[in-house]
Amino acid sequence: MNVRKRNGDLEPFDRQKIVTAVQKAFLSCNYNVGINVIKEIVDNINVWDDINIEDIQDQIEELLMDYDYPNVAKEYILYRYKHRLARNIADSNKFNNTIEEIVSGKTNDVTNENGNKNAKQFNVMRDLVAGEVCKKLYKELECNKELLKLHNIGVIHIHDTDYRFMHGVTNCSLVNLEDMLQNGTVINGKLIEKPHSLRTATTIATQILTAVSSSQYGGVSITLAHLAPFVRISKEYYEEQFKDLSQNKKKVLVNKFLYKEISDSMQTLLYQLNSMTSTNGQSPFCTIFCYIHEDEEYIEENVALIKEVFKQRIKGMKGPNGSTINPAFPKLIYVLDEDNINPGTKYYDITKLAAECTCKRMVPDYISAKIMKKYKEGNVFPSMGCRSFLHPWKDKDGKYKFWGRLNIGVISINLPYLALESKDYNDFLNKLDNIIDKISAEQNKIFNQISNVNTEVAPILWNYGAFARLPVGSKIGEAIKDRYCSASIGYAGLAECVYHFGVEYGTKEGQKLGLDIMKHMYDRTNVNKEKYNLALSLYGTPMEATTTKFANALKQFPIEKHVNDRDYITNSYHIPVEYKIDGYSKIEFEAPFQEYSSGGAISYVEMPDIRKNPEAVLNVLKCIYDNMMYCELNTTSCDVCYTCGYEGEIHMDNKGNLKCPNCGETNRYKLYAERRLCGYIGILTNGISKGRIADINNRVKHF
């Protein structure tokens, strides 16, 4: 029998500890009873596996009353109260210490939680302090106590608890930029009318993204196709300006001025999104979708924008000393299709440009139109931010709608934890069902809370087009009913789970067992989807700081190789980072999991230094197109040393310290190093979690 301690750890049930505690209560009351009487009382405690310490203590109080020792029961209650008070004081001191460390610029788990936030800066400090206060309020006043206990133990992780106390706040989204630009919007109480040029439309788009990012806590996605009509508007303007010239001269000048505006606009997009800051102290977590065929009416204009956004990203930006660096944002997604994947196809030149961009800047990420159409009812659309995908949904006219939709949040499951505490595989599946049911109920509660909130909490989202155009003062629920938004059940450590049940994950047998578990989760999630009429879906949790938390939670169990012998656990369904496998095999192995992970999934392959080898990237893209819906290519060759000008991989030790391999520079303010932390690129110089450091340092190249 095991007892669950208050910190979540399991330890063998020790009856003698209880005897000693009860004996102290008797002595405090000057009762001189024999040890046999005390043992008799303790022997009547009903103990089961994984019993909570509080349940044991509740039974002791009742038994002391049943045995007619009310004074001793009172003393025992007082004993519990004193210990609870001491724990509360300790918790309060811990909270105060965390706040003090944040505002004094010290490093802790909170400051290292997000690799894209510089916790040394005032605006980030303020956001982190506010976040810690909101976490405390949410946990004490709002959160389901059973789920909170599971969260604290590390069985699950309730993401973004620093925002959940604010009812109505939502996660990631596909911003309906088309509606806002074509029909106007309102920002900070000021009407922004339809722009009359691409240049103005792009500037407004960046302002919209910053405003939306400040009204939610997840990533935002837009598409270049929504800017494409303004390319035509600008072209028509230049044609009017030069209408009195000869046709040839007019064409030359129109093309010249139009290209200049396209170039300036895409540069504006890049610079604005990297220089503007949302209310949480960071650049908007923005994704830009590059799909040639999104709007066939404006395909020529869309192609021009896609080409230029790649060219601008290849140029990069400059760091403080003038060195060219790779900005972490915006994330780019490029769609591979039948007319751009093979040499000789109509748009293959754009794919070659995308490959060059990947070689130098680690973006874009890639969606296969062929595979996505199989999974998403013939549709092609981007993730919301990093990897969260919507389900197909039709409006009242029977038309598919994706832009203007959103996700309400994620709660993730630590799969290897459930496996390690289970008696066998069937017991594991039962525990998994139980956890999925609890999370589903909580997500339904969150959905209902959001539905009952007034739209004025975020006018740009609900009143002025980003998500909806509801009347001011109405309830959000009008916009998100009938499964309009998604709610995510995350999971991590599928590989460790499979290893625990005696199968090597990277094999065919491991793939089969992994897919069996995935399908089981998928089916159970769909049961709850129907039960609550809520668009619940499985989400491959990326984990940044959570990987450390989940790994630490596994340490209480006997150590098993490939399961709980590291400081991190593997993201979602991925093959472990240290597992030796070639990139093509990795893509083929992981591809089937994305169908079941319908609420969010992305795979990656680790590339060597590919700065001068776009052909290698093009070969990988063909494999992605034929096999996998969504994939990214990682490289470590985008780093820069400001001291000596070195470009390549900056080394990182197991404590997160950085060092230039060329000149030996270790001052993190003189180094620019970035890695794929989860789905987004993260800046190592901002600090990252212990588990993610170990994960990064253990990654093997797949080519």
PLM features: residue spans?
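Charged, amphipathic alpha-helical regulatory modules used
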Residues: 1-105, 694-700
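Conformational switch/transducer regions in large eukaryotic molecular machines and scaffolds
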Residues: 14, 655, 679-680
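Buried hydrophobic packing segments
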Residues: 22, 227-231, 494-498, 674
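Conserved catalytic cores of very large enzyme subunits
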Residues: 92-484, 504-673
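Metallocofactor- and cofactor-centric catalytic cores in central/energy metabolism, strongly enriched
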Residues: 262-266, 270, 500, 688, ...
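Contiguous, well-ordered alpha-helical segments that form the cores/surfaces of helical PPI scaffolds
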Residues: 487-500, 519, 676
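Long insertion/accessory domains within large nucleic-acid-processing enzymes
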Residues: 662-703
